[in-house]
Amino acid sequence: MMKACGFDIGLDHPFFLIAGPCVIESRELAFETAGRLKEITGKLGVPFIYKSSFDKANRSSGKSFRGPGMDEGLKILADVRAQLDVPVLTDVHDIDQVAPVAAVVDMLQTPAFLCRQTDFIRACAATLKPVNIKKGQFLAPHDMLQVARKARDAALEAGGDGNNILVCERGASFGYNNLVSDMRSLAIMRETDCPVVFDATHSVQLPGGQGASSGGQREFVPVLARAAVAVGVAGLFMETHPNPACAMSDGPNAVPLDRMAELLESLVALDRVTKRSGFLENQFV
């Protein structure tokens, strides 16, 4: 069990939610989405962390919108945090960003493509902030054990207790321009002794599927989210937007903001059943 962002995280507790637009498009959008998500999750009793990126460093095309940049993006996230009283998360992309980002946010996130970059992972963990490490699309779930150990060792060396690491499943490459979610990975990744998060929106992404940008199949977000909650997860990650068709990044796999309440309500009910009845796989070892 981990305590972060003011709440308990683990399989003995209700799932928490990381949600927000893929990228910070404007100050107004950040406040609109964070405010609405706070309202929805508050009514449902879902612990909530607001997420949005100041820079999308791995866009398919060099001409695609990347975000407002670190300085402006962190100002917006800091204001959301202070004025709406919600914890915030954003991703970091290189070691130089780690310290300034950690000074602002409540939780760091590392991109899937960078999960094997040892110095980078160690730098994030050494801040002693909670770090959500996304599993690369190219890794087997059991490979995350070594990634988690690197991070935990760095946290211990920095004077922490090593209990600040989360691991996140976001699908595995399945041929070209496609991902598949193996729900066994959620159980396997528990062997890291880290809370496991499921990214329900990037798992339906079609990477590079539109040539200069990625496609997605948002209609399958509820399917995979329900499956993950039925297996048992500590947290869910879902990107959302008021108008996904106009989103500047990852619109095809974003959940429409006006559908989030309905989706979360069904997931909360399923989570209660799953965690009340225990985890079936433990009976077959």
Curated annotation (Swiss-Prot):
HAMAP family: KDO8P_synth. Belongs to the KdsA family. One of its GO terms (molecular function) is 3-deoxy-8-phosphooctulonate synthase activity. Its EC number is 2.5.1.55. It is an enzyme of class 2 (transferase). This is 2-dehydro-3-deoxyphosphooctonate aldolase. It is found in: Cytoplasm. It comes from the Bacteria. One of its GO terms (cellular component) is cytoplasm. Keywords: Cytoplasm, Lipopolysaccharide biosynthesis, Transferase. It catalyses: D-arabinose 5-phosphate + phosphoenolpyruvate + H2O = 3-deoxy-alpha-D-manno-2-octulosonate-8-phosphate + phosphate.
